[in-house]
Amino acid sequence: MSHYPLFADLKNRPVLLAGAGKVAERKAESLLSAGAHVRVVAETLNPQFQQWADEGKIAWLGGLFEEAMLDEVYFVIAATDDGVFNRRVFEAAERRAKLCNTVDTADLCSFIVPAVVDRGPLKIAISSGGTAPVLARKWRQIIETLIPLHTGTMARIAGKWREKVKQTLNNVEQRRYFWEKLFDSRFGIFAAQNNIEAAERELITQLNRETPFGGEVVLVGAGPGDPGLLTYMLCRRYRLRIPCFTML
């Protein structure tokens, strides 16, 4: 593994962004959405950056980069079209032991930013380790079509009730079974309809069942008997250690 994957909490943390063009704009959008305090060093601002500056959403430090600017920031992103300037920022970050990402220049990065599928609290990061960014973006597009938008709603409701479920079901296996069953129930349908009240009622109903970890046996047809034809549902039952019988 060439890079260590992680998700960073940037809420109220200062970060430095070098550049104020279109590429830097996309970086700034994601940083702001994560709650970061974005400091921008650039000679000029494009209209979007200017609007953010006028609204107090970013701090514009002007166009002169000084190494001391790195002292108080969490990390720096170099997103200009000036390769010499980007290298200068990276080398300064190395001296100050600060993480630096230089857009589209893997050898000037101490960290990389993955392609992300964003479904609210649920986020999936895809990275090629800087070797093939277009391939990572391609797979992001594919995965985005597989994960419905209401997955984020499901995750938010689950997060709200997680502690209650933990208090009610003190066994890890019970809790895992409960969540697996819930996410396959009408709970997902209600979440897709943005009917939060109905989704929570479904959660409460299942949680209040007298035997939430009751027994279950599954009978599955396996066609010609090829194990590669086992359905996803059967594989999930195996993970939950539910006895399964196949008909050949």
What does each model-found stretch correspond to?
Residues 3-48, 52, 67, 214-248:
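Glycine-rich, flexible N-terminal cofactor/catalytic loop recognition
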Residues 35, 39, 73-83, 122-130:
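Short beta-strand and adjoining strand-loop segment in the mid-core
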Residues 38, 60, 99-100, 245:
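Hydrophobic beta-strand scaffold residues
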Residues 42, 60-64, 104:
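Short loop/edge segments at beta-strand edges and connector loops
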Residues 53-71:
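Glycine-rich, highly charged phosphate/nucleotide-binding loops
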Residues 75-81, 86-113:
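ADP-ribose/adenylate-binding Rossmann-like module
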Residues 100-152:
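E1/E1-like adenylate-forming module used to activate ubiquitin-like modifiers
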Residues 130-211:
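An accessory alpha-helical subdomain
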